[in-house]
């Protein structure tokens, strides 16, 4: 890859216009063939490949020629045939060609991304999952509307080719890409008119398609969002910084008070903030309801005009932050804004100000959690614990471990929220449901189960000390964490109720638009 990058730096116009010769570089397919042998691009067992097999570059050239002839399609997106000894070598060549095609297409994309990020240092720092939590803490208090937008992941192959055409001017290099995309669309795994861009299969080709598609979506949208903000110099802080204070004071209105002090309210122009995790994104907006409707309309119109793609209206949902349950990336919680009063002194008490802003205060949504537990058959609609009948065929240890895992995940999930006392009601429901499940399995009562297994068995699984077993904190830090918020970056992977809750919300929104 370094050689290809040097090739692009020597002559940028040549790199953009003549990518097709890179398809015939032997080193390129040697690298891709090594990736395939390492098992990074195929799930087939490697014992069927003999170490004495020679990799023929002439065969690769023939396959490249077959790609351009759509009547002679090669197998790129299906596994080996029932006879792996006869067809696995053919699959290795197909995987190598697909890997080589991806390596070539990554050259202009990586160079363009590098130059774009170098020119936007502030954008580079917000490309990590760890930026989600500062976004919640810093941007939500200054917003009153939240838009939950889902990136369209089903797109026609020709639209993808046209987006590549804006970056790659070499038309011959786009012919193999077009053929590969159409072949994937017509494969038995994807019998539909459009293709799924979301990388459900962890291959280099699908990851590249998804990254490029998201990059194109956000590169234009991000510039539009920046243009919509007229006060970019004013940072969202509890009080304005002293640096360039003469510029920031233009956005502040001073009210007189009886005690001759001055109270400052941070009054800003409409502000739009954007964050994305996976295929879902959140747009936090400070403005009126009309501004939110316009932002939603422009977002749908942008996708329709730029990508020639009709996006369903329910894929961009807006609601008021203080009245609804917010579905942040990986989190769903209720938010309460508490007024925060801060008094500052500047320049030897020549400027005394009282700053009033909002403090982000997430609340544990007990009622939605109870609804999810009822949906998963841990309790009824009134919150009364019931036995989990589908788990009665498991062993006692498996049942205890599953209930214990759900409780610990829920507790860690909402460790960044205040008002966690309601979580112990959830703990009571889960522990009693666990006892009823064991009693149903052994065809006895809860009292008999506790007597036979011992009360310490439930205390071990649902003990309060285990709430912090996954955190590398001391006892003092564990006690302090009861008063402080702790955000976990691996929450989207460990909470089993996020996807279920999100599906319920999506169905409700779709039903509203269908009416």
From Swiss-Prot:
This is Maturase K. It is found in: Plastid, Chloroplast. It comes from Pinus koraiensis (Korean pine). Usually encoded in the trnK tRNA gene intron. Probably assists in splicing its own and other chloroplast group II introns. Belongs to the intron maturase 2 family. MatK subfamily. It comes from the Eukaryota. The keyword Ubl conjugation does not apply. One of its GO terms (biological process) is tRNA processing. Its main location: plastid. Keywords: Chloroplast, mRNA processing, Plastid, RNA-binding, tRNA processing. One of its GO terms (cellular component) is chloroplast. Transmembrane segments: none annotated. It holds the Pfam family Intron_maturas2. GO terms for molecular function: RNA binding.
